[in-house]
């Protein structure tokens, strides 16, 4: 439900927001980077989403309807995103769906994203941040993991609009062209993001 009971050896240190939400350390990194407090409603876990849906069902808030994983769990995710945006009076909302595309843990969040794009096609943009390894013994950047990530997203009904290609080195033009072609994007929508000394 929250990060307070997670094993820090497996999940990293617990970060507590100013309003008391126990979450993972990524939120602390985001707060430092943005130099802003991030309120509790900007963080959700699968457990907290499931718990909210179950509690509403127990309180008869679904009017006796059969409550199902789909669509009710993705609808709860969408409801929370919209509520957080409204409360913050946000011009836009940047949402990180953690994990790796294709993992079962994030499939319902991807379904929520797909449903949002379907409902608001001009207001939803998908950005895939993908790692392009450079095996030391070969010294050549590999694009296959990113190609498979895009295929997995496509299988979930999502086509990324932008790919941010993370790597130890900058991506060259031939690989950029290859990724654009094989991932159904224009070259300008494939962005190289090599490691740097400081992100500030």
Which role does the model predict for each range below?
Residues 1-200:
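Flexible phosphate-sensing "switch/lid" loops adjacent to ATP/NTP-binding sites
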């Amino acid at each position: 439900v929250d990060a307070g009971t997670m094993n820090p050896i497996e999940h990293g240190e617990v970060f507590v927001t100013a309003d008391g939400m126990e979450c993972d350390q990524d939120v602390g990194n985001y707060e430092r980077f943005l130099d802003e407090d991030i309120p509790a409603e900007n963080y959700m876990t699968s457990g907290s989403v499931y718990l909210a849906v179950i509690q509403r069902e127990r309180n008869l808030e679904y009017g006796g309807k059969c409550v199902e994983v789909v669509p009710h769990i993705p609808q709860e995710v969408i409801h929370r995103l919209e509520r957080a945006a409204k409360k913050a009076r946000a011009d836009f909302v940047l949402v990180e769906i953690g994990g790796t595309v294709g993992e079962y843990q994030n499939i319902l969040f991807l379904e929520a994203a797909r449903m949002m794009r379907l409902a608001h096609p001009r207001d939803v943009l998908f950005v895939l941040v993908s790692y392009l390894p450079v095996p030391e013994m070969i010294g050549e950047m590999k694009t296959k993991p990113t190609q498979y990530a895009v295929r997995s997203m496509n299988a979930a009904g999502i086509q990324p609009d932008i790919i941010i290609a993370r790597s130890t080195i900058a991506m060259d033009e031939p690989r950029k062209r290859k990724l654009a072609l094989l991932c159904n994007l224009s070259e300008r929508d494939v962005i190289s993001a090599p490691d740097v000394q400081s992100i500030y």
